[in-house]
Regions:
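Short, well-ordered secondary-structure micro-motifs
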Residues: 40-41, 94, 126-129, 193-195
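Active-site environment of divalent metal-dependent phosphoester hydrolases
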Residues: 9-11, 33-38, 89-91, 116-128, ...
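Short, well-ordered alpha-helix to beta-strand connector turns
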Residues: 24-25, 72, 112, 149
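His/acidic metal-ligating clusters that form di-metal
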Residues: 60-128, 213
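Active-site neighborhood of phospho(di)ester-bond hydrolases with catalytic His/Asp-centered motifs
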Residues: 1-6, 27-32, 84, 114-119, ...
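Core catalytic region of metal-dependent phosphoesterases/phosphodiesterases
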Residues: 1-66
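Acidic, His/Gly-rich catalytic cores of divalent-metal-dependent hydrolytic chemistry
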Residues: 130-213
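Short, glycine/charged-enriched secondary-structure capping and boundary segments
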Residues: 16-19, 42-45, 97-98, 129-132, ...
């Protein structure tokens, strides 16, 4: 199990999230909200809602929690695989990958066959022909992997999806089959919304969970 960052920063259960991910994940990468909460990067350019949530999170986490967040790696590369929270071109800049042109830049920068990212909260899979360089967005929830392609995968978001589907999103990589599959898991959104409101966090953060955008 791998977590590509932003464990904290929007929700009302930051400490339990850190504990759960810490217990279960083999790899945890740093997201920009994690590092903002830990005081590693400034958050003055974040939107007002995000700033308020970060300030609240800083108050409720322990110094040990913040130390853990501050020491998370930005990127992990293993053989054909590159994992990062945002663009791998300069991970500390947390650049967004929103268009095929951005994906092409990523493939020109890295040598790996697979690149897995998060950051935009929008699940997407793009494959690029090794021979021609042609890219296409794959719409199926599960695809079989082929040697002739390179793959860019945005894994979406567990805690705040933004693709009009409020269910938690994750990706299953099966190296034996081999395949990549997007999984959606329902959870108690109302309970999460109630916690956010009870803690005095911006109501938009609660509303957004159901709006999923």
């Amino acid at each position: 199990m791998m977590c590509l960052g932003d464990i904290v920063g929007y929700g009302a259960d930051p400490a339990p999230c850190i504990d759960t991910i810490g217990d279960r994940a083999n790899l945890i990468l740093a997201g920009n909200h994690d590092l903002a909460v830990a005081g590693v990067i400034p958050f003055d350019e974040f939107n007002p809602v995000a700033r308020q949530a970060i300030e609240w999170t800083q108050k409720v986490l322990t110094s040990e929690d913040c130390d853990l967040l501050s020491n998370l790696p930005l990127q992990y590369v293993d053989g054909d695989y590159c994992f990062t929270h945002a663009s791998p071109i300069d991970p500390m800049k947390f650049g967004y990958i929103r268009a095929l042109e951005d994906v092409a830049e990523v493939f020109n920068h890295i040598g790996q066959k697979f690149c897995f990212v998060g950051h935009t909260h929008l699940p997407v899979l793009v494959r690029m022909s090794e021979k021609t360089g042609k890219m296409e967005v794959v719409r199926e929830s599960k695809i079989m992997l082929e040697e002739r392609y390179r793959y860019f995968v945005n894994v979406g978001s567990l805690g705040q999806p933004r693709d009009n589907n409020p269910e938690a999103c994750m990706v299953l990589l099966d190296e034996d089959e081999p395949s990549i599959q997007f999984l959606r898991v329902p959870y108690d959104i109302s309970a999460s919304q109630e916690k956010i409101l009870a803690e005095g966090l911006p109501s938009y953060l609660a509303e957004r969970l159901l709006l999923a955008r």
